[in-house]
């Protein structure tokens, strides 16, 4: 089958190649991939996450062509969206059935491919904040894939969302997604109950100081590539009643399929916008990757792989 493989010597470390079809494990279904989307992890940490020749990508949507040998999961012919580490940017993908969500009628597979990794990450992060109804929630990196989902999902849960972006142009459209405030600086921002922090570095440090008593800041990502310094002695003197957590989407992992279907349901109901900022053939995958890396994509970049 054709696939995009990791090659550090190629532009954006991506090269089109012929690779063997994946062989599914007993609990995995084989899907014909129609579309896949890029995530920051696929690009920023490609050289450490993927070996040379490996197929990257976490998100793919397509049609089941071979059901799981153990009898789990949807039957052949079912349209699905999938979330797993690696293997998305190819004509075929083997995925554990627990990580498949059935795509409802009326949602195209390009839209479905934009949801899994960023959407599930945002959904689980907002849940971790607990009850946010009527509370203030700060989302940093709000113009990115996870950020745009977090803004929408926190707003849907009743939060007063403060969206932080790196520049005023990056904030375009965020109020329409549910942000009550869009800021480029945290100076003057009132205290918040929770933080979905996607940038890291000094921004995480500053965000922690905004937490109200009992609040929590979730370190979801480090798009800045910079380390963060937290003054724990200052926190003790503050009272120690606020927390900073390293957040990972697979904490308490029990399969991603249910969350994918929840997100798809919100899209079908017109309550969630997948925010696809780039869409095109996978022949243009390098273009998509470079635009995403340069922060020129508002939201998700999706490549169309096959017609299924």
Regions found by a protein language model. Give the residues of each.
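A short acidic, Gly/Pro-enriched loop at the edge of an enzyme's catalytic core
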Residues: 188-195
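Mid-domain Rossmann-like dinucleotide-binding core that forms the NAD(H)/NADP(H) cofactor-binding site
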Residues: 115-185
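Glycine-rich beta-strand-centered segment in the early N-terminal region that forms part
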Residues: 20-37, 45-87, 198
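C-terminal capping/lid region of NAD(P)-dependent oxidoreductase domains
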Residues: 271-276, 286-308
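NAD(P)H dinucleotide-binding glycine-rich loop of Rossmann-like/cofactor-binding domains
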Residues: 44, 80-141
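Glycine-rich phosphate-binding loop and adjacent beta-alpha segment
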Residues: 202-271, 305-308
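Short glycine-centered segments of the SAM/dcSAM-binding site in methyltransferase folds
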Residues: 79, 136, 160, 215-216, ...
